[in-house]
Amino acid sequence: KPMSLSLELPSGSRRFFHGIVARCSQGAGAGQFASYQVTLRPWLWLLTRTSDCRIFQNQKVPDIIKQVFRDLGFSDFEDALSRSYREWEYCVQYRETSFDFVSRLMEQEGIYYWFRHEQKRHILVLSDAYGAHRSPGGYASVPYYPPTLGHRERDHFFDWQMAREVQPGSLTLNDYDFQRPGARLEVRSNIARPHAAADYPLYDYPGEYVQSQDGEQYARNRIEAIQAQHERVRLRGVVRGIGAGHLFRLSGYPRDDQNREYLVVGAEYRVVQELYETGSGGAGSQFESELDCIDAGQAYRPLPTTPLPIVRGPQTAV
């Protein structure tokens, strides 16, 4: 069943966390209250509970994804895609969950998603560019206050960590078209970084395309996915209104180059609710958020982690 939690924001409005109850357990409890644990998941998670073998013909990947959603009874999604996508003559879901199927298609095409939460539903937003994201009301700029300054009434960050990791600087793909055996299909995409060891190349075959322009897009998607891992900033604080998919600008940090606009690609929250039983002790209500961010100017793409299904031998149509 659906369930939502609400959190009061500084403005007096409320932020909602909505999901499907995927698991519920009851413990022994303490005092006069029972103990329950509830796991909420987005409706997309239910696609991990169904599998199929299907063929889609003459459709673009966004249309295939939306058809899979609708066929399973889901309509709470939004198309915020801005790029053009090729038409697939033939696309097969083969002995895999519907979640794995749509995930690997999105990974190949450079599509990702995030969720917008409302009181009675959550909406999956298909995205592929900066224009799909907004700053939530009242959070266009969020200040950094050092922990030594003590408690601040305004939502703020109090901890900052930045990590950079060397990544491959270029990717070359190649493939073969049996209908055009002489066609040159090798493509290359690169993103230069101003540091040592930034130009190591990757090569992969087959690239899963028969037109070089499609290969160029796939190579770009993959190198952007890799380079999105190059620099990550983790910000911890009391910031109640920001979540994955949101934009904000950091202000007040001692390193001025870090006072820039970020895209949130992951969020964790810790909420402690005050206890209702007299004499039970414990702290009052507390909230802490930890946001995983990238520079808003860096394109975000999903890493290709979903395995391709394997067809073992020829398949008869009889």
Which residues does each PLM region occupy?
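Amphipathic alpha-helical and helix-coil boundary elements used as assembly
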Residues: K1-V318
